[in-house]
Amino acid sequence: MVIGAVSTVAGILIAQFIGAQETKEAWCSFDVSLICGLIISALFLLAAGVFPSQILGLYTKDMSIINTGSVYFKIIAFSYIPMAVSNIVSSWLRCKEHATIPLLASFGAVAVNTVLNYLLIFGKFGFSCMGIKGAAIATLISQLFNLVFIGIGFVLCIRKDGDQPILSLHFKKITIRDYLIMILPILISEFLWSLGQNVESAVYGHLGTSNLAAYTLTGPIQGLMIGALSGLSAAAGVMVGKRLGRKEYDEAYTESKKIMCAGLVGAAAVSALLILLSGVYTGFYRVDDNVKELGKILLIVFALYAPVKVENMILGGGIIRSGGNTKIIMIIDIIGTWCIGIPLCLLAAYVFKWGIVGVYTLLTTEELFRLAVSLIIFRRRKWIISLC
C-alpha cells in the first residue's frame, strides 16, 4: 500500500509533466519517487527481517502460526524492493503509453508464481517439498522476474522514444514540499484503509468458521474482478493527467466522463456474468453445502455493488487525484471507512448478531457514500488543476 502511494504520486506528476512536454520535470518526478520507494521498501525489509514475530503477533496469538508465518515473512520481505522499483517504472511506462509492458510483466509474473508454487510447495519434478517456504520463494522469484521484464522494456522504450534519462532531484514547477503534500494524504489514507481491512477481517473471524470460510472462498474472484477493472483507474489518471498538463480542462472533463461510462458498462457486464456463474464457481470447492450457499450469496452481493466500487476506483483513484488534490480523497476514505463502514460492520456483527451476508452487505454500503461525495466533487470541477 505504501509503495502504491509513491507510484500513485509518480503517475500524477509524470502524466502532467509529459502532457505539458516538461521532460526534465517528468524525469525529476520519476527520480524522486524511485528514491522514496527504495527508502520505504528498505525500511519495511529491515522491519520484517528483525521483528517478524512481533509484527505477526499483532494479528494472532497462535505461536504455531507465528513461527510458520515468520519463515514466509522473512523471505517475502526481499520482494519489497523489486516491487517498489517495478511499480514506479510501470508508472513511467503507462504515462509514456507503453502500458502493454507492465501488463505482460504481470501475466508473466503470475505464470511464474503459479508454476513455482506447484513445484516448490508440493515438491514436484525433483524439487524438495518446501510448503510455505516454497510459496515465499515462488513469490520472490516472480517479483524478480517482473522487475527484469519491466526493466528490459523500460530500456527498450527509452531507446524507441529517443528519451534521454535525466538524474535530478530538483523540481522547477513544484517543490519537494508540494511532493510531500501530495504523498502524505495517500500514505495516511492507505494506512488507515489497511487498518480498517484488518478490523473487518477480525470481525469476520468472530462470526464462526462457516461464515469466515464463505468469505474466504469469494476472495479470489473478487480480487480477479476488481484487478481486471482497476486498469481503468490507472488509465484515467494518465489520460486526464496529460490533458491537465496541457491545460485542456474541458477535454479533461469530457474524457473523464467517457472513462466513467466505460467503467460502469464494463462493471455491469462482468457483474451480470458473475451473478449467473456464482453457483458454478462455489461448486468447484470441496466445502459444506452451507458454505457454498453463503459464498454464492456473497458473490451476488459483491456483484451488485461492483459497479459502484469500480466508479469509486476511477473517480478517487484516477480522475480526482490526477489534479494533485489527494487530500480530499483521503478525507473521503477516512470518513467512508472509519465513520461509516467500520461502525456498520461492528453494529451488524455485535449488536444485530447478523451472519457474514448481513455484515458484508451493511458494511459495503459505505461505497455509496464514497460515490455520492466523489460525484459532487467531480461535477464542481475544483479538482481540475494543472501543476505545470
What spans do the regions from the language model cover?
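Small-residue-rich hydrophobic transmembrane alpha-helices
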Residues: 1-46, 83-102, 214-278, 310-332
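Helix-terminus/linker motif at the lipid-water interface of multi-pass membrane proteins
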Residues: 56-63, 119-130, 187, 191-224, ...
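Short alpha-helical transmembrane segments in multi-pass integral membrane proteins
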Residues: 14-81, 127-184, 240-305, 348-388
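Transmembrane helical elements of multi-pass membrane transporters/channels
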Residues: 75, 86, 109, 142-146, ...
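Juxtamembrane/interfacial segments around transmembrane helices
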Residues: 10, 86-91, 160-167, 189-197, ...
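A gly/Pro-rich, aromatic-decorated transmembrane alpha-helix motif that marks the paired
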Residues: 115-119, 342-346
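Short runs within selected transmembrane alpha-helices of multi-pass transporters and secretion channels
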Residues: 7, 11, 76-95, 102-113, ...
